[in-house]
Amino acid sequence: MAGWQSYVDNLMCDGCCQEAAIVGYCDAKYVWAATAGGVFQSITPVEIDMIVGKDREGFFTNGLTLGAKKCSVIRDSLYVDGDCTMDIRTKSQGGEPTYNVAVGRAGRVLVFVMGKEGVHGGGLNKKAYSMAKYLRDSGF
């Protein structure tokens, strides 16, 4: 799915993100394109199911993983009409910094963006939302 890499490149171009990904969540449940060498490159179908699944409460208590990286869910509006986003924060393991992550849901794909250190989640949410809306309006 080489054509999807341009969407990842577009998400990365302003310099506030350290990685981005486009991930299918319907019939093609895998990473379609991602920043090379990043955590998102390793997102699994099980992790995708956790994000889009019917249980919208369990991950608030237990957290979730993205590419085996432990994360906390801050806000879940993935299935709220007009929003379709989720705000996540990575957990520190061994004292490394934590990072904000935003997920936007289109019709068949999820848009993931992870900010650099100190990048506020609100800007990431807007970026994920805008790309997901564009893809949703384009039939994806």
From Swiss-Prot:
The modification N-acetylalanine is found at residue 2. Gene3D superfamilies: Dynein light chain 2a, cytoplasmic (3.30.450.30). InterPro entries: PFN, PFN_euk, PFN_sf, Profilin1/2/3_vertebrate, Profilin_CS. Its main location: cytoplasm. GO terms for cellular component: cytoskeleton; cytosol; glutamatergic synapse; postsynapse; presynapse; Schaffer collateral - CA1 synapse; terminal bouton. It comes from the Eukaryota. Keywords: Acetylation, Actin-binding, Cytoplasm, Cytoskeleton. Isoform IIa is the main isoform and is abundant in brain. Isoform IIb is a minor isoform. CDD domains: PROF. It is found in: Cytoplasm, Cytoskeleton. GO terms for molecular function: actin monomer binding; ATP hydrolysis activity; phosphatidylinositol-4,5-bisphosphate binding. Binds to actin and affects the structure of the cytoskeleton. At high concentrations, profilin prevents the polymerization of actin, whereas it enhances it at low concentrations. By binding to PIP2, it inhibits the formation of IP3 and DG. Belongs to the profilin family. Occurs in many kinds of cells as a complex with monomeric actin in a 1:1 ratio. Interacts with PFN2. This is Profilin-2.
